[in-house]
Amino acid sequence: MVQQTNNAENTEALLAGESSDSGAGLELGIASSPTPGSTASTGGKADDPSWCKTPSGHIKRPMNAFMVWSQIERRKIMEQSPDMHNAEISKRLGKRWKLLKDSDKIPFIREAERLRLKHMADYPDYKYRPRKKVKSGNANSSSSAAASSKPGEKGDKVGGSGGGGHGGGGGGGSSNAGGGGGGASGGGANSKPAQKKSCGSKVAGGAGGGVSKPHAKLILAGGGGGGKAAAAAAASFAAEQAGAAALLPLGAAADHHSLYKARTPSASASASSAASASAALAAPGKHLAEKKVKRVYLFGGLGTSSSPVGGVGAGADPSDPLGLYEEEGAGCSPDAPSLSGRSSAASSPAAGRSPADHRGYASLRAASPAPSSAPSHASSSASSHSSSSSSSGSSSSDDEFEDDLLDLNPSSNFESMSLGSFSSSSALDRDLDFNFEPGSGSHFEFPDYCTPEVSEMISGDWLESSISNLVFTY
């Protein structure tokens, strides 16, 4: 006891001698009466074994050097200007502590070290356990889970069932796979902690491993119980896309919604078969409705198998750069050829790689540099769409289709663009087509990070060719 008070006097002398900020008010010192709830370790509290405990029995951490210093300085500021708000005092204290020289901080660092050693002596079995913030009101299960889980891991998020599954992530719930690092939920099929929608896509993890893409707002199902999460995602998108789906014909709407489910691995096979079925449904009525519907598709709407970009399509082979690029072109242009093309290729592999398919891809790439070439995107992808559906049973040839498209042209600009993109001797083709082989790598192999909202905006009305439609009226 005597030694500790001597210690306190020594520190007071040091503080008076060395601290430039402290001035005449230092007789308050560390040994004087502390503010209520503070952890000053000298004076009457030195022999009290509960000097660091709150009334509820929680053991507080020992003060660091800044806390030792700011406790003294805060008291002085509160005496000088009692009306100052607490947050303003803290802001000023932080600025002043940063401006302090290291030599001025030494006595406070020593005092903090002394407090730390005393804390270790008084509470030998103390362990720092930060309180877990649990959304629901089950405080009991969270405390038992905190005892069972490792206390040092800040990324743990305690599940409701006694700490069984922890959805990993950066502390505070920002656990997309890029930042947090551990985006898979650990225990069994306990997907409750991971389905918080605060940050993009989450993983409802199945058997331990899940895949998280940080772009689309999809809840990817990573294993066995994938169907429910996929259905929930499709239902949430159905509300957003209701206006867009109203424009589509019947088969196209089914195709449109099956595409959302196709983003999950468990539902991809059924979605590809559904896509081929709806393409086959839409094919007979296509010739009748083509001339009426095509103008809407070319210039305002979504195509007969419109793809909201969420990644690589269902039937597409991820290792095939051509399929990847066609998916991206499909997301950026109103018509999406490659899903029906891919599904027909899945049913008959020989029919998948027709030359017209290559040609549509070449014209897609040829049309991309020009800013006014969005209608030509639509025409070229529509041509490859018709070629893939003709390989699966419809009998339209590319020449008829070109004539139809040229009849439909509203402007000479579009006519020249589509002619230029369809003639294989154009300079754009010669520039861009030199490395175009089915197996060769392409520099367009990046994944597509469009969210459904962005792709809806891209495929929306700003692709109109007349300038009056580009004026926003809202």
UniProtKB/Swiss-Prot annotation:
Tissue: Testis, brain, and heart.
Effect of residue 95 to R: Abolished acetylation by KAT5
Motif (9aaTAD): 426-434
DNA-binding interval(s): 59-127
Compositional bias annotation for Acidic residues: 397-406
Effect of mutating residue 45 to R: Does not affect acetylation by KAT5
One Pfam family hit: HMG_box
SS bond list: none
Biased composition range(s): Low complexity: 31-44, 138-149, 266-283, 304-320, 336-354, 366-396, 407-416
SMART domains (UniProt xref): HMG (SM00398)
Subunit structure: Interacts with UBE2I. Interacts with HDAC1; interaction inhibits the transcriptional activator activity.
Function: Transcriptional activator that binds with high affinity to the T-cell enhancer motif 5'-AACAAAG-3' motif. Required for IL17A-producing Vgamma2-positive gamma-delta T-cell maturation and development, via binding to regulator loci of RORC to modulate expression. Involved in skeletal myoblast differentiation by promoting gene expression of CALD1.
Protein name: Transcription factor SOX-4
Organism of derivation: Homo sapiens
